[in-house]
């Protein structure tokens, strides 16, 4: 193999090295919050909503002792927020942060830091913007319509490689067929497998994946691979200096667990706007009369409404999809 050949890799391998290899983007001390805001960072209302969801799951399981497994935990911000929100609630929360980076200093000692979900958990497994960072290969249809792997250099240049084959070809044909020359897709099979593996660790409860996503009929014609650095969208270059991400085919992830691609008794796919609305986060403004009877309370409520509006906004975080999989004791490990 020549040095020139070694420079070119499929996007899955290149992303793995850039994000999680030595000196990789996600292993840096500043963590994801140093480069972009997720719903977790946008407002404590998000952690409050997850805390209410955790309470619902505990009630369904008939227990006050419940597991909360945060997959792709970043630096533990969501877990810290949920633990704070459940203080004094009577819930005994066993918190697990699943993350490939090292445990950050100062994290609540109640949080167990691990690189894989604990098996046999009973409670809520929550994965916010995790699946979009599971590395995947990119395919593009050549001039004859043949789907080929896209290879990338360390500088971000691309070329077409071998035809897509095997399980990847089957996934494309089922979930994201490429018919026109130049059409592109991210091959989501590794994400399906990652999600199914995470769900399989639950003995009972709910697994929830939250991400920017698409479903059959709304796939982007040229894929969605991009980069983020210091709060700005940048070209996807696998050099470790930026996040590399693409939207998730969440309907395929749903089917990987044996559920319907949307809906059904054990699987549900809804927008974040709808999911948070059910949990009391709506973005409605407080009544103006409150300003005269309780000015400080009105200001607080107005601020909270603004944060809720960001979490549920059309064209923004509110359009994220929530995939929920319910796991009964008979289904678990």
Predicted regions and their residues:
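A mobile, often basic/glycine-rich helix-loop segment
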Residues: 124-176, 222-230
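Rossmann-like AdoMet
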Residues: 1-116, 121, 139, 274, ...
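Hydrophobic/aromatic-rich, well-ordered segments within soluble, folded domains that form packed cores
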Residues: 11-17, 127, 214-218
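Long, Lys/Arg- and hydrophobic-enriched amphipathic alpha-helices
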Residues: 169-333
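A residue-level signal for conserved active-site and pocket-lining positions in enzyme catalytic cores
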Residues: 18, 125, 253
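Gly/Ser/Thr-rich loops at beta-strand to alpha-helix junctions
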Residues: 73-78, 132, 214-215
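A short SAM/SAH-binding and catalytic strip from SAM-dependent methyltransferases
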Residues: 119-142, 185-189, 193, 201-208
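Active-site flanking residues adjacent to catalytic metal/cofactor-binding acidic residues
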Residues: 69, 98, 125-128, 210
